[in-house]
Amino acid sequence: NLEISKVKQYLKLNESGIETPATVAVLGQENIIEAARKLNIYPLITKHNRAGKGLGVQLFQNEEELEAYVNSPLFESSVDGITLLQAYIKPSDGRIRRSEFINQKFLYTVSIDSSDGFQLCPADGCQIGKRPEQLETSEKFQITEPLPDGRREAYENFLKNAQIEVA
């Protein structure tokens, strides 16, 4: 199922001609360092194969940082035991772009400030306890320019072919 496996998502995106960062799927915590050596790309991020909101996403500048994390009590395994190692593509302005689709049609693109980490759910800005004026001045999430037409069409076609309604 594409909706619960990032590995399958990346494979299908690549098969459809949509480029994704270099990614390796690793089964088991004990295999991560060796897989990272073979991938040999830094900086890199780790992420859970099955998770959302940026859970499990960590950035590493070098092998020493990765090894310290993997061998520490802070390491969190994905529910399926698969950790993804992925080349980190640093956004020029420090903001990650995420596009949302409903019924296989483009809805909007949001620009997200990732300087505080990768747990990036826009709904988190609406947590109880925040006052409305705090939300008004938040720069963390901003609706931004839409995808270029060619890229939007490629994603819409991918979603249609994969029969995914919401992405």
Model-derived regions, located:
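Phosphate-binding site of ATP-dependent enzymes
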Residues: 58-158, 162
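Active-site nucleotide/adenylate-binding loops and adjacent lid/helix of ATP-dependent enzymes
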Residues: 2-95, 152
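Conserved active-site loop/cleft motifs that coordinate metal ions or position small ligands
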Residues: 166-167
